[in-house]
């Protein structure tokens, strides 16, 4: 029996969406299928290193561990800076142009995503103690994927 997946709907920003649309057309698949495939590739990397070893570039935690990260790069997953990721998140203007994409996660992946959101402490992502938005984490992982690196925002070069 297959494990049940949890759905998270998200609008990605215009530049990420255009990159996904172009590649989906080349591969002759749906945008959502491609987006899920890319995100799962990055999610596998996150799950391998664990949420504790996922850091935002140039954050206090990153700067305090920079020497360790350089020596053991494979043990860490780096997210682009929050201000960089925010440029690639949908705005209200984008909402009229592009529909949401449904992303699917296993329970243990959702637990990891929740830990990442809580660790990043980005305003408006947690409300009343509950995770309200995964958009910075998901957009950050998409930006790290080799397909989206053409956008120049990746924190990982592996």
Where are each of the predicted segments found?
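A generic structural micro-feature
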Residues: 2, 95, 130-132
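Short amphipathic alpha-helix starts
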Residues: 4-21, 58-59, 63-64, 98-118
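Short, positively charged interaction helices/loops
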Residues: 45-96, 147-158
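Conserved small-residue-rich
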Residues: 81, 87-125, 135
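Short, basic amphipathic alpha-helical segments that act as recognition/interaction helices
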Residues: 26-55, 125-158
């Amino acid at each position: 029996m297959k494990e049940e997946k949890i759905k998270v709907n998200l609008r990605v920003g215009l530049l990420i969406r255009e990159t996904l649309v172009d590649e989906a057309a080349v591969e002759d698949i749906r945008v959502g299928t491609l987006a899920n495939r890319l995100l799962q590739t990055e999610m596998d990397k996150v799950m391998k290193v664990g949420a504790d070893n996922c850091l935002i570039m140039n954050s206090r935690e990153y700067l305090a561990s920079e020497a360790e990260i350089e020596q053991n790069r494979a043990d860490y997953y780096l997210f682009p800076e929050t201000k960089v990721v925010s440029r690639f998140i949908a705005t209200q203007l984008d909402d009229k142009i592009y529909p949401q994409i449904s992303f699917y996660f296993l329970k243990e992946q959702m637990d990891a995503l929740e830990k990442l959101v809580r660790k990043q402490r980005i305003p408006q992502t947690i409300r009343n103690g509950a995770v309200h938005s995964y958009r910075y984490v998901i957009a950050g992982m998409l930006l790290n994927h080799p397909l989206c690196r053409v956008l120049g925002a990746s924190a990982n070069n592996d």
